[in-house]
């Protein structure tokens, strides 16, 4: 069953993608359980996505096995409205993931190191002149 799409303006899409990272296709299979993802379909329809339940996931679509990502809208399987669904990698044009605390810490440390390195380069450049 296909979910009816909600149309989001470009501004709304941009807002919903704040703090999400565009994942290169060759890394999609490394997105782990529990990660929240958002994506664009091949038809360029924005989807708010869900939490990764299983990835990669082998889905049978029209008697053909396809690599997919299995998503859920919450972790409470008994909650009213809880749903799971699979999206074939072939049907995704762009996939975004929300980084966890570890990745945000790494990013922050890299940014600090890069800033310090840039300061060192500027200091050296001023001494050479």
Swiss-Prot record:
Enzyme Commission designation: 3.1.4.-
The protein's enzyme class: hydrolase
The keyword rRNA-binding appears for this protein: no
GO cellular component: a single term: virion component
UniProt KW keywords: Host-virus interaction, Hydrolase, Inhibition of host innate immune response by virus, Inhibition of host interferon signaling pathway by virus, Interferon antiviral system evasion, Viral immunoevasion, Virion
Single annotated GO MF: hydrolase activity
Gene Ontology BP terms: symbiont-mediated suppression of host innate immune response; symbiont-mediated suppression of host type I interferon-mediated signaling pathway
Subcellular compartments: Virion
Domain of life: Viruses
Oxidoreductase recorded as keyword: no
Broad class of the protein's primary localization: virion
Family from the record: Belongs to the asfivirus C129R family.
Protein role: Plays a role in the inhibition of type I interferon signaling pathway. Mechanistically, specifically interacts with 2',3'-cGAMP and cleaves it via its phosphodiesterase activity. In turn, prevents 2',3'-cGAMP interaction with host ER-resident STING1 leading to inhibition of downstream signaling pathway and type I interferon production.
Name of the protein: Uncharacterized protein C129R
Taxonomic lineage of the native organism: Viruses, Varidnaviria, Bamfordvirae, Nucleocytoviricota, Pokkesviricetes
């Amino acid at each position: 069953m296909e979910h009816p799409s909600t149309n989001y303006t470009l501004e709304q899409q941009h807002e919903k993608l704040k703090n999400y990272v565009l994942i290169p296709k060759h890394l999609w299979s490394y997105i782990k359980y529990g990660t929240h993802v958002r994506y664009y379909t091949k038809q360029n329809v924005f989807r708010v996505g869900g939490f990764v339940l299983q990835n990669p996931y082998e889905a049978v679509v029209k008697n053909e096995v396809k690599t997919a990502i299995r998503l859920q809208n919450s972790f409470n399987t008994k909650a009213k409205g809880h749903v799971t669904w699979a999206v074939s990698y072939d049907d995704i044009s762009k996939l975004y993931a929300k980084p966890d605390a570890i990745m945000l810490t790494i990013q922050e440390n890299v940014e600090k190191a890069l800033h310090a390195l840039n300061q060192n380069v500027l200091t050296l450049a001023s001494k050479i002149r």
